[in-house]
Amino acid sequence: MKINSTRSVRAWLVAAIASLALAACATGPTVRTDYDPTANFAQYRTWGWYSPIAMEQSGYSSWISERIKANVQREMEARGYRFDAKSPDLKVNFQAAVQERSSVYSMPRSDIAWAYSYRARSYVAVPVWYDEAVVNNYTEGTLTIDLVDAAKNRLVWTGDAIGRIGSRRTPEERAVDIDQSVAGIFAKYPYQAGSGQPLPIPR
């Protein structure tokens, strides 16, 4: 029981920490998408949940996963997809992950060097300019939403919301982060239910 409990807590923390990152920047998270070019999106009219949801593999849900579900449902219904728990055309899965990263950049610095001047017959101060390498370590969080062809159990579309984990945020702030991240991912999804013609995606 102790091992299972530890894994469950760890899984919940991964989800919670990842949600902190998704609106850390003023411009919101970076969104990346990919899709199966052979998929016929015109055949998809209904949707349901993949089982088990990747974020809920610990055996229970959290307020974070429930919040994501509510947002996904709103986005799918807004595109005309009808929920079908028994036999959907598309199954939706989602997960969160964190990763330690680092970035290196140059910072201009100045210092004073002393050089002997034969004209002044003394040592004089000489300014010296140089670039100093600065390493910035940070934690990156990712929320991934997958759309899976239910008949083939094949991934046909995926979207990632990626951002840095910032300072400690309240549950209310994290809820807003989740809303914005899911909306940002689906803003890049170009299809409506029953249509294989992609709509223009805002840049």
Task: Give a label for each model feature.
Residues 41-45, 83-88, 147-154:
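A short, structured loop/turn motif at beta-sheet edges
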Residues 21-24:
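C-terminal motif of bacterial Sec signal peptides marking the signal peptidase cleavage site
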Residues 10, 60-61, 138, 170:
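A generic structural signal for short
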Residues 30, 79, 94-154, 199:
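Surface-exposed short loop/turn segments
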Residues 26-38, 132-203:
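C-terminal/domain-edge helix-coil "capping" segments
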Residues 48-105:
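N-terminal segment of the mature soluble domain
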Residues 2-14:
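Bacterial N-terminal signal peptides that target proteins for export
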